[in-house]
Amino acid sequence: MMNKLIFGRYIPGDSFIHRLDPRAKLLASFYFIGIIFLANNWQSYVLIAAFTAFAISLSKISARFFIRGVRPLLWLILFTVALQTLFTQGGEVYFQWGIISITQFGVTNGLFIFCRFVLIIFMSTLLTLTTAPLELSDAIEYLLRPLRVVKFPVHEVSLMLSIALRFVPTLMDETEKIMNAQRARGVDFGEGNLLQKMKAIVPLLIPLFVSSFNRAEDLATAMEARGYQGGEGRTKYRILHWHLRDTIVIFGFVLLTIGLFVLRT
């Protein structure tokens, strides 16, 4: 199974982060993604990294889960870093070949982008590992509630997002099963050039799509059997409650923002 995939999984627990209101965690995660772009020097990234490490320690979840969360996107991160490093001009030139050059600014910006990617993935992983899918769906629905004024389907969108998030690990597990079955029949996904590798993936996509549609149909049938008719007039078994600890967390992010502004100057 594809146990390497962490994003989308939930690990039950009773830590400080687990007990936070899902609305606070969702707001904090989006806020974090926004303020990380305020960092423009190494002192700022050290501050953000220390803040992230402290948040991870409060979750009581092993750091290896967060490191494994980076692996599926590692090649994309490295590709982005390489482009930034090779095509950014400015500062001392370390290497020059045609339009490709490695400069002081390019290396610095590349490392900054790497740090941004990793820290954002860490914080996003922290959100999904400590928040149950139903809680996340309720939080999204609550935060999007003002859009009901313009007839936006808030409940349906929040349900769709939570189901999509929940089924990411399931689809990856299904992909691994299909790949193992085809390897047993002699298919080698790592053999040949790029075109041959792409052709080898085609037989993988068809059963994966069939399996996905079957799962979607089973889910729809189960929801209809339980009387699901949308969010109109629907009551909730679990009511979200905002506590002092949630306010403290948001205040902590405000302090982080102030610290980043100070370090920028």
Language model segments and positions:
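Transmembrane alpha-helix interface motif
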Residues: 1-44, 48-59, 142-145, 149-152, ...
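Alpha-helical transmembrane segments and their helix-start/interface "positive-inside/aromatic belt" motifs
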Residues: 25-26, 64-74, 246-249
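Transmembrane helix-loop junctions in multipass membrane proteins, especially transporters and channels
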Residues: 41, 45, 60-64, 88-96, ...
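Small-residue-enriched core segments of transmembrane alpha-helices in multipass membrane transport
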Residues: 51-57, 70-78
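A diffuse structural propensity rather than consistent per-protein peaks
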Residues: 62, 102-103, 243
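Juxtamembrane/interface alpha-helical elements of multi-pass membrane proteins
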Residues: 73-187
